[in-house]
Amino acid sequence: MGQEEELLRIAKKLEKMVARKKTEGALDLLKKLGSWQMSIQLLQTTRIGVAVNGVRKHCSNKEVVALAKVLIRNWKQLLDSPATPKGEKGEERVKAKKKEKGLDCSDWKPETSLSPPRKKRVEEPKDRRDSVDSKSSATSSPKRPSMERSNSSKSKAETPRTPSSPSSPTFAPSVCLLAPCYLTGDSVRDKCVEMLSAALKADDDYKDYGVNCDKMASEIEDHIYQELKSTDMKYRNRVRSRISNLKDPRNPGLRRNVLSGAISAGLIAKMTAEEMASDELRELRNAMTQEAIREHQMAKTGGTTTDLFQCSKCKKKNCTYNQVQTRSADEPMTTFVLCNECGNRWKFC
């Protein structure tokens, strides 16, 4: 077995150790690597440096980590040596071909400030690139100022892409159609005003009231913002609830009351979901509340103990029941049952 095949075998073993998080036997393999005469071509073809560096990062054995650092340091010195090995000449030939095609190595250098994670991922290939870059800098030093200027211009061009505040897909910045007098200077707030105005215009009847919907939406948004003092998630949820209720086709009375002035902008900005609900929904909620109160506040001691009913949860028959007239006199009585074992309640007529 040649040295290259043996290095590939050791590299696979080390990678498996790192993947399984079991580095027993890594010390013997590293000692074996330290006794060999290494070349740049072997480092490049076998990528043994990547495997050793992975052991160095994930192993908890101090002796293994120390030996891995020594090997990596020695191989770095080999890469940085003034003599030009065969592997480096091969890279120079590839570099020359790229230049003939109009490609520049500076276009893909990962050593700018825009890509720091790539430096941490793999150290051995980084060192190989460093040696190639040092070689190219010695032969083409007059081009360095222009390369630095291009890198600085790239970094300047990238800085405006960083968002100043978190944004949700609902309020993503887009072209705003509001009049300049209603713009706030904040893209999130402007988008909210635009969406509130669209909710007020959900039906064509807004024309009958002769109301400026953009102005009214701006006033509603301003009241919300003045109360919450930020455009965080609480602010956005407040705006969403106004929009959904104003656009609800089953609750047109709310939007008409806002358009007519019966509900002011300051009031709609603070109303709860229950207050904005339609009369039909309020009655349904009240009925459900009264039913729940009647079920859960029924006195336990006033019932009759029986074994005629079986609980659906605990499957036992230790129950107490009450019969109450919840509807008209000619309707059958409602039986409320309470399980004395698990507390489960149910009813039937």
Curated annotation (Swiss-Prot):
It is found in: Nucleus. Residues 101-110, 121-133 have a biased composition (Basic and acidic residues). A zinc finger (TFIIS-type) spans 307-347. The modification Phosphoserine is found at S115, S141. GO terms for biological process: regulation of transcription by RNA polymerase II; transcription elongation by RNA polymerase II. Its main location: nucleus. Residues 5-82 form the TFIIS N-terminal domain. Signal peptide: none annotated. Transmembrane segments: none annotated. Residues 80-170 are annotated as: Disordered. Keywords: DNA-binding, Metal-binding, Nucleus, Phosphoprotein, Transcription, Transcription regulation, Zinc, Zinc-finger. Gene3D superfamilies: 2.20.25.10, Conserved domain common to transcription factors TFIIS, elongin A, CRSP70, Transcription elongation factor S-II, central domain. One of its GO terms (cellular component) is nucleus. CDD domains: TFIIS_I, Zn-ribbon_TFIIS. It comes from the Eukaryota. Residues 134-144, 160-170 have a biased composition (Low complexity). PANTHER family: TRANSCRIPTION ELONGATION FACTOR A PROTEIN 3, TRANSCRIPTION FACTOR S-II ZINC FINGER DOMAIN-CONTAINING PROTEIN. Necessary for efficient RNA polymerase II transcription elongation past template-encoded arresting sites. The arresting sites in DNA have the property of trapping a certain fraction of elongating RNA polymerases that pass through, resulting in locked ternary complexes. Cleavage of the nascent transcript by S-II allows the resumption of elongation from the new 3'-terminus. Belongs to the TFS-II family. This is Transcription elongation factor A protein 3. It comes from Bos taurus (Bovine).
